[in-house]
Amino acid sequence: MTKFSEPIRDSHVAVLAFFPVGAHAGPLLAVTRRLAAASPSTIFSFFNTARSNASLFSSDHPENIKVHDVSDGVPEGTMLGNPLEMVELFLEAAPRIFRSEIAAAEIEVGKKVTCMLTDAFFWFAADIAAELNATWVAFWAGGANSLCAHLYTDLIRETIGLKDVSMEETLGFIPGMENYRVKDIPEEVVFEDLDSVFPKALYQMSLALPRASAVFISSFEELEPTLNYNLRSKLKRFLNIAPLTLLSSTSEKEMRDPHGCFAWMGKRSAASVAYISFGTVMEPPPEELVAIAQGLESSKVPFVWSLKEKNMVHLPKGFLDRTREQGIVVPWAPQVELLKHEAMGVNVTHCGWNSVLESVSAGVPMIGRPILADNRLNGRAVEVVWKVGVMMDNGVFTKEGFEKCLNDVFVHDDGKTMKANAKKLKEKLQEDFSMKGSSLENFKILLDEIVKV
């Protein structure tokens, strides 16, 4: 890692993680670790729920990262029906919880907080930072496309609301969004009531982010250049900070691989394997899991399927026995490392930003089935903007539809084009990390913004 000169400062950074979605807290911690290593005299107080912290801090961390467990905001005895309910309860309680915990951390550390480094969802951090006379730096856990959609919420609602718009109509009135359609935008941006908890929080975020000293995302400059330019016109400072894990390699001996995925992959030919995973929040419904299994079995494509144990009951009877030589189904897999394996041929994904970025960094094409939030925007980028993958017809898995997508990638000429385009994006990412690229300079700018007093 490039060494930066250590500033002589007495900084205390409060890091506020968004726990209900692991795709948010993990990348924020990764950046925090990198910042802590670059500025060892700065204290980073990392606030997150006990359960989330337990999974994130399973290994050692720098001494200047102080871990603080906070309440999840769910009243004792409350029965939750879906993940969104947990998100809403947490967002409602978060301002009170964080104010109290930050005050306690200041006493414990003996330093006033000088910077708030938070998930962008926490719009109220702008007010807390002002109260503390601290700077606010926000992390958006998605791509430039979804951030742009949120920052243009008012214009999108005004423009679409003025006419009987087709869901297929493109967003040509927003620079950089010309290839995206109305149907790709998250519902909370366009259609949902802004008085309900989650859409209201996201709308308040869109109004608050221009107050932040800096906003950064996990990405690299050449992935969405026009959108980057657009966002720099809306925000005080906008930075792409590509995670180091995308380029670093882990030896098989060092890797956590409890189910032997790497050993299995080592027996397969180059670019032949389909990897299937849909993140940590939601899986496709049972009938689609059946369709995936049927499509895999019929296609004969080798596969590694990361599927939660509770959902394995939905697999067709006898599927695991019949496909024992063809593939493996495991409750967890080392996704980042597997995607880099030479045998990997395609990533079958929900198109969450982290998954998309991991595929891009590995030069692996994608088959997408968007599920929620920014997934449709990312899927559109994969299929139409970057041309590195294909989406499921009508956004759902069917046996025939999945087989067609597998053939598109592994058999037809379209697959060769996807692979070539994916390779080009991988090379652009590698160049971005070189001395000629912007990643190191952007990280230095972020570091200076966060540790200044």
From Swiss-Prot:
Reaction it catalyzes: kaempferol + UDP-beta-L-rhamnose = kaempferol 3-O-alpha-L-rhamnoside + UDP + H(+); UDP-beta-L-rhamnose + quercetin = quercitrin + UDP + H(+)
Enzyme class, broadest EC rank: transferase
Annotated Pfam families: UDPGT
Binding site for an anthocyanidin: 24, 150, 373
EC number of the protein: 2.4.1.-
Entry keywords, A to Z: Glycosyltransferase, Transferase
Consequence of gene loss (knockout): No visible phenotype under normal growth conditions, but mutant plants exhibit altered flavonol glycoside patter.
A biological process term (GO) from this entry: flavonol biosynthetic process
Membership in a protein family: Belongs to the UDP-glycosyltransferase family.
Tissue distribution: Expressed in leaves, flowers, siliques, and stems. Expressed in the shoot apex.
GO molecular function annotation: quercetin 3-O-glucosyltransferase activity; UDP-glycosyltransferase activity
InterPro entries, per database record: UDP_glucos_trans (IPR002213)
Pathway(s) served: Flavonoid metabolism
Function: Flavonol 3-O-rhamnosyltransferase that catalyzes the transfer of rhamnose from UDP-rhamnose to the 3-OH position of kaempferol and quercetin. Possesses low quercetin 3-O-glucosyltransferase activity in vitro.
Annotated protein name in UniProt: Flavonol-3-O-rhamnosyltransferase
Active site: 24, 119
Binding site for UDP-beta-L-rhamnose: 280, 333, 350, 354-355, 358
